[in-house]
Regions:
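Extracytoplasmic/lumenal acceptor-recognition loop(s) of multi-pass membrane glycoenzymes
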Residues: 152, 323-324, 396-447, 461-551, ...
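Extracytoplasmic/secreted cell-surface and envelope-processing proteins
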Residues: 165-166, 255, 481-485, 566-571, ...
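Active-site-proximal, structured, solvent-exposed surfaces of multi-pass membrane proteins
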Residues: 643-768
Length: 774
């Protein structure tokens, strides 16, 4: 989580003073659209708390808010959904157990994922539970529609994956209401015949006949029938969804319409279905995991008993968990990782387990009443019922503290196993989140190598002052960087140097299509690179090619750590000049590296269509790795006078596309002066017009130019302009996409205010009517 402190600070210092919630930052990836593809609302909350508390404290409080409020959010869902007492309290216990679950660490929702940086997901999930409670009331009794719409907008502005869960939950809530109604309309026997026929038809079509389209059509027909049966509730849910979408449109619409410029990291689909869904303890890999047999048993009992009683809330939870399991198994290899669905699956199991515990407790109470020790309605009977959440909480606290190794009176043996009376937990199975939290929140200053990291920061501040501000590419070494607190520590160079020294690597890997080219460079310039992006043609340490790529990318400083990288870099003293030494780090100045540069050859325009995902990245990667192609860049668009080049398929899994070969016109040398670069404005002067100039800043459609034609995207992911005047200025700003989203939000806000006033008037009329009857 160490580098996440950059985001709220950038929002506070750069965006909000300019009345913006999104903008451009040159701090990472040679520039990227800040807050355009990453939800800003949790960051805005940090900025708000920072008005009263120190920044570090504000960050920590908001970061843990999602998991801290999860039990209350689960209680809120159950309470508003009118689950019988003591289910709201038991749901809070279920939420407590969910956040302490440590079978997954980066998927989102629990404490472990929050500590890995997924705190926006946790906040979004807690808000989703609140929203589902509100939308239940809106569907059922037409109350709280405006609040439900606002809650849905909040979910959207926290995390889009939780928004998908919220929408799916809303649809299933309406369908559950329809399913619950069928036995009353058709009778129990006919209802079961209908459900059985549907299930058999789906299984036969899907499994035996392998007809996915027919399977989908039958399911769609069944769903439409249920929606018609519950038309009033469906209409209310639709109005909530439309209004919530309108309120968040100022951010969601630009995200959606600019999605083609997202970077696809290629997270590999999880295919171990049985292990991930039911037996996580059998998964291989690092990290502690525990069996969830008890959870499956309780959830299964709750599901069976609830369906036998035809409990509407159980129908909803069973439908939700079933759809999540099927979606996890059938989700394609796509930008949205199927692992992101697992937290919702686990949460639905915990909520079902709360029902299962209650049914078991009811059975125990029935036995007591049969023995006349606690008759219904008596003081003893009420005490037994009220004891259910207390007993559940006691068991949850005892189990959680046992696995955390914090049980009162417990001790560690010689093997570092924790023992508490007759119970014990091995060191391998212990819950690690307490140690991780202490590591995360104790600060960089409390790390063993804090002096080394601080010296590096001070060195780079001085380098910026003496040699000028610019981008830095640092060698990756997990162990060395991890000793500073996190391998992401140098990402904060722009944070500590007030934007003077940018870092080529940052967070938000999906936010810029420059990311793959950075990791290709990192692999060339590191002895132990990270290589987090899949399906790229990485090379091992290759300093000469790395130097060329740094110059191609406008990198000003190279920070080398390993003996191999340092010694090889010193061989190329004409290109890399040693300017500073900081502990184990050698700082090189990359000679003749500029961000604005005239081109030697006229660009070629690709004839390919770039419709998102890797349609641009794959051929651009092939160009990036082929030194013979570097002199002639490829653009995605350009004037009619530029020659065209095709996109060809090649037999290479990592880069299956490449640009064709084509000659180009040599250009006259160009003199560029008065270069000025800030976050959202780049300006320069040229001595000749009509000669293309490359600006080595990540391309994004929100850039516009005055005094030139363009900008067009050019390989690998920069901008090219054709000056029509001697003075050229590029500016990042709003476009029609952002304006459209903002207009929709303004209209949605006006509708929200009108609906709220209408609800108030209706309440007044109802109250007056009741008074008249009295």
């Amino acid at each position: 989580m160490g580098a996440h402190v950059w985001g709220p600070a950038f929002l506070r210092d750069e965006l909000l003073p300019n009345f913006q919630l999104r903008g451009w930052s040159g701090d990472w990836y040679a520039g990227f659209p800040a807050m355009h593809f990453y939800m800003f609302l949790p960051y805005l909350a940090i900025v708000a708390v920072d008005l009263l508390l120190p920044y570090g404290v504000a960050f920590k409080l908001v970061a843990v808010a999602g998991v801290a409020l999860m039990p209350a959010a689960a209680w809120f869902l159950a309470r508003l959904s009118r689950w019988p007492f003591p289910l709201p309290a038991l749901s809070a216990v279920a939420g407590f157990l969910f956040v302490f679950d440590f079978n997954f660490t980066i998927y989102g929702g629990n404490i472990a994922s929050t500590l890995a940086g997924e705190f926006a997901f946790s906040i979004g999930l807690a808000c989703t539970l609140v929203y589902l409670g509100l939308v239940y009331r809106a569907i059922e009794v037409n109350e709280l529609r405006t609040l439900a719409s606002v809650a849905l907008a909040v979910v959207a502005l926290c995390h889009l994956v939780t928004l998908i869960f919220a929408i799916a939950g809303t649809v299933l809530m309406v369908l559950a209401a329809g399913i619950h109604r069928i036995p009353k309309l058709l009778g129990v026997s006919k209802a079961w015949l209908l459900f059985s026929s549907f299930a058999v038809a789906e299984i036969v079509l899907w499994r035996l006949l392998d007809q996915p389209f027919a399977t989908l059509m039958v399911a769609l027909f069944f769903v439409l029938g249920l929606l018609c049966l519950e038309f009033r509730g469906a209409f209310r849910a639709l109005t909530v969804g439309l209004l919530g979408g309108a309120l968040s449109a100022f951010w969601v619409v630009p995200f959606y319409l600019r999605r083609d410029y997202l970077n696809d990291m290629g997270w590999e689909k999880l295919t171990e279905l049985r292990e991930n869904l039911f037996f996580p303890a059998e998964l291989s890999g690092a990290g502690s995991r525990i069996s969830i047999t008890w959870l499956l048993a309780l959830a299964g009992f709750g599901a069976v008993a609830g369906l036998f009683r035809w409990e509407r809330s159980i129908i909803f939870l069973v439908a939700l968990s079933s759809c999540l399991a099927i979606a996890f198994a059938q989700w394609p290899q796509d930008r949205i990782w199927n692992a992101r669905l697992l937290p919702f699956w686990y949460l639905s199991l915990y909520l079902l387990a709360g029902w299962g515990f209650w049914y078991l407790f009811q059975a125990a109470c029935s036995q007591l009443r049969a023995g006349r020790s606690a008759a219904p309605g008596t003081h003893k009977g009420r005490l037994v019922i009220y004891a259910a959440p207390i007993v559940a909480l006691g068991i949850a606290l005892a189990g959680t503290s046992l696995y955390l190794g914090t049980s009162p009176g417990g001790s560690y043996d010689a093997d570092n196993d924790f023992r508490w009376g007759p119970l014990s937990v091995s060191a391998e199975d212990r819950n690690f989140v307490s140690g991780w939290a202490e590591w995360n929140f104790s600060g960089y200053e409390n790390r063993a190598a804090s002096e080394t990291f601080n010296d590096l920061i001070q060195t780079m501040k001085k380098v910026g002052k003496d040699h000028g501000c610019g981008r830095a590419l640092w060698e990756y070494d997990k162990d060395e960087l991890g000793s500073y607190g996190t391998p992401m520590a140098p990402m904060l160079l722009p944070y500590w140097t007030e934007g003077c020294i940018g870092s080529m690597e940052g967070l938000y890997f999906e936010s810029s299509q420059t990311v793959p080219f950075h990791f290709l460079m990192q692999s060339e310039l590191s002895s132990s690179p990270s290589r987090p992006m899949r399906d790229l043609p990485y090379s091992s340490l290759n300093i000469p090619q790395g130097i060329s790529h740094m110059k191609m990318s406008g990198v000003r400083y190279y920070l080398a750590y390993s003996d191999e990288a340092v010694s090889e870099s010193k061989v190329f003293s004409e290109d890399l000049k040693v300017i500073a030494q900081s502990g184990p780090w050698t700082v090189f100045l990359v000679q003749d590296s500029s961000i604005v540069q005239g081109l030697a050859y006229e660009p070629l325009v690709s004839e390919g269509s770039f419709l998102g995902k890797r349609s641009w990245i794959d051929p651009a990667v092939n160009w990036f790795n082929d030194q013979s192609r570097w002199l002639i860049p490829i653009a995605d668009d350009g004037p009619d006078g530029w020659s065209r080049v095709s996109v060809e398929e090649v037999d290479d899994l990592s880069s299956p596309l490449r640009f064709g070969n084509q000659s180009s016109r040599k250009l006259e040398p160009l003199k560029i002066t008065e270069v000025s670069i800030s976050n959202e404005v780049i300006s320069f002067r040229v001595d000749e017009v009509g000669i293309p100039v490359v600006v080595k800043t990540s391309y994004f459609p929100n850039w516009s130019v005055s005094g030139a034609d363009g900008p067009f995207r050019i390989t690998p992911n920069w901008m090219v302009v054709i000056p029509s005047e001697n003075k050229v200025e590029l500016r990042y700003g709003r476009t029609s996409v952002e304006n459209f989203g903002l207009i929709v939000t303004i209209l949605g806000t006006l509708i929200l205010v009108a609906l709220k006033r209408h609800e108030k008037r209706r309440k007044v009329v109802v109250c007056s009517s009741k008074d008249t009857k009295v």
